[in-house]
């Protein structure tokens, strides 16, 4: 058996570094993380509380960025869609920050059924992001 630790990072393909930087740093409050100097392809890393998002330009990765076109299947709940999820410390504060930055809620805030509140948004490249408030994490 492998003894794994926490999830280290998620890597996503992007189109526009400035829009991505604004979303992950200014809206979600992540910090710039140092990329290895040996990386000879464009992208940026973001860090918050020891977790990282690694971004790579779609041309360098040879992949399409985002997946919003196929993400919410008719007749299925949004929770079945591929997404990243970050915990947040306030529903009201999160909604206010999203409004201030012109980020549209695609669903929520809504009760998850166990006392938590879910909100769903898209990043600039169409990656779905869930923001979840679990009050027991912040008490």
Question: Where are the regions a protein language model picked out?
Answer:
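A short acidic/small-residue loop/turn micro-motif
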Residues: 61, 113, 135-138
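Vicinal oxygen chelate
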Residues: 14-18, 78-124, 128
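Short, P/G- and charge-enriched loop/turn segments at secondary-structure junctions
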Residues: 69-74
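Short acidic/His/Gly/Ser-rich catalytic and metal-binding motifs that mark active-site loops
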Residues: 63-66
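Short glycine-/small-residue motifs
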Residues: 131
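Core segments of cupin and vicinal oxygen chelate
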Residues: 13-58
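N-terminal beta-strand motif that seeds the catalytic metal site of vicinal oxygen chelate
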Residues: 1-19, 39, 82-84, 135-139
